[in-house]
Amino acid sequence: MKLAIDAMGGDYAPEEIIKGSLKALDHFKDIEIFLIGKEEALKGLEGKSERLKLIYASEVIENNEAPVAAIKKKKNSSMVVGLELLKKGEVEAFLSAGNTGALMAGSLLILGRIKGIKRPALAPILPTLNGATVLLDAGSNTDCDEENLFQFAVMGHVYAQKMFGIEKPRIGLFNVGTEEEKGNEVVKKAFERLKNSRLNFIGNVEGRDIPYGVCEVVVCDGFVGNAILKSMEGIAFVISQLLKEELSRNIFTKMGALLIMGGLKRITQKMDYTEYGGAPLLGISKPVIKAHGNSKAKAIFNAIKQAKNLVGNDVLRHIKEEIELTGDEISV
């Protein structure tokens, strides 16, 4: 399996991207990595592995650049070069921790959408009390209509099926209350479409329901989704810091911490976003993964693992098939 990695994207590029890529090569013997970046950034990697191919790109798309303009102007950027490799079929997936807007714009311009999909969605996996849930959209589409939300549900259904191994994943529509009549007109219309679909729709869910794990898929527009994502990341960090402070307060708390160290590690590991890799751009015609902007080697390794599973489970083909099956429920 051939995967392309943007070595120049993210807050800790290229060092941490390279470390994560080399770790993945060491761990997964069935992958080849095409590492894309400036020649000086990739210096010294020649001969590291026969499954590592270096692709030199002289430009980098920065986080503060306008997405569409950057994609069109910087044809030799690591991001554009990676997307072009994917388009040509030279690799099977592309991963970047770079500019999210540029990655989405480039994916749309270079790769295009799955037929029938109006808007792709960013779909991160969030940790919950009972496992994990897919959230979509997490920031790509701040304004959505009911058709967009319905399609997000279809894509989330397939993604959860293949990645979690659940035949009928539960789908919840994010709202300000669980009652059917709650929400704005878009959410109310989306509720009706989901209720009358073949999907395992459980109704409206509230913010507090997500960490409880009441469903495997949470559907919302990108504005709300991004707020949910960032809030959960912030809460996880605060809880982790509070635990560290309290358990190191004195000799007695330190002794207690030693006794529960195993449990604490499991809790912090479950709450750690780096364990869940990146977020696929579902709805794009080929596999593209967006890693977190502040990803270090561990997060990159897990994002590569996720890309491998996305390709191995043939998720995009199944999304295409599901969209065709639900064609009578979607006006394209």
UniProtKB/Swiss-Prot annotation:
Catalytic activity from the UniProt record: a fatty acyl-[ACP] + phosphate = an acyl phosphate + holo-[ACP]
Pathway: Lipid metabolism; phospholipid metabolism
Keyword Transmembrane: no
UniProt enzyme class: transferase
E.C. number: 2.3.1.274
InterPro entries for the chain: FA_synthesis (IPR003664), Phospholipid_synth_PlsX-like (IPR012281)
Coiled coil residues, start to end: none
Transmembrane segments: none
Record localization: Cytoplasm
Signal peptide: none
Alphabetical GO biological process terms: fatty acid biosynthetic process; phospholipid biosynthetic process
GO cellular component: cytoplasm
SUPFAM superfamilies: Isocitrate/Isopropylmalate dehydrogenase-like
Domain of life: Bacteria
Main location: cytoplasm
Pfam families: FA_synthesis
GO molecular function annotations of the record: phosphate:acyl-[acyl carrier protein] acyltransferase activity
Record keywords, A-Z: Cytoplasm, Lipid biosynthesis, Lipid metabolism, Phospholipid biosynthesis, Phospholipid metabolism, Transferase
Family: Belongs to the PlsX family.
Assembly: Homodimer. Probably interacts with PlsY.
Annotated function: Catalyzes the reversible formation of acyl-phosphate (acyl-PO(4)) from acyl-[acyl-carrier-protein] (acyl-ACP). This enzyme utilizes acyl-ACP as fatty acyl donor, but not acyl-CoA.
Name this polypeptide is given: Phosphate acyltransferase
Originating organism: Caldanaerobacter subterraneus subsp. tengcongensis (strain DSM 15242 / JCM 11007 / NBRC 100824 / MB4) (Thermoanaerobacter tengcongensis)
Lineage: Bacteria, Bacillati, Bacillota, Clostridia, Thermoanaerobacterales
